[in-house]
Design a protein with these regions (language model features):
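RNA pseudouridine synthases
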Residues: 1-152
Length: 152
């Protein structure tokens, strides 16, 4: 889940990612150097444009790739303290109680539903899937379902 609503609602973010020159804990998009990274995203639901559920499919697997790419289009991950610009991200369009709940979410609202790769020895493609965690269900219920979610 991200703050805001991606515009356009579906797209591809491409850019090289490298360690930030300003904060060694962060990664950043860079023009020169870094590693090529591609993220395809699609907004699945939005709560008044304040927070949105976004599906990301990665062509590459760079450190902090989703965090960096979503931040680059102004849609930081809910609960991502490292990539927030200044303290709590401003949320417009939600009740004060819901804003407080979102801003106190204790972790990044990020979940890998499926992960696949080619095994280095056998050459076999392996894929693993896992259910959506309960805390993210609660976040979704609070932000999307109870507030009249809108598709895209």
């Amino acid at each position: 889940m991200v703050y805001g609503r991606p515009e356009p609602a579906e797209g591809t973010i491409t850019g090289n990612i490298a360690r930030s020159r300003f904060d060694r804990k962060k990664m950043a998009l860079v023009e020169n150097g870094g590693k090529h990274a591609v993220t395809h995203y699609r907004c699945l639901q939005s709560a008044n444009g304040a927070v949105s559920l976004v599906r990301c499919n990665l062509e590459t697997g760079r450190t902090h790739q989703i965090r960096v790419h979503m931040a680059s289009i102004g849609c930081n991950l809910v609960g991502d303290r490292l990539y927030e610009k200044s303290g709590k991200t401003k949320i417009v369009g939600l009740s004060p109680e819901t804003k407080a709940f979102v801003n106190s979410f204790p972790r990044q609202a990020l979940h890998a539903a499926s992960l696949g790769f080619v095994h280095p020895r056998s050459g076999e493609f392996l894929q693993f899937s896992v259910d959506f965690p309960a805390d993210l269900h609660l976040l979704l219920d609070t932000c999307l379902l109870n507030l009249g979610a809108s598709p895209k």
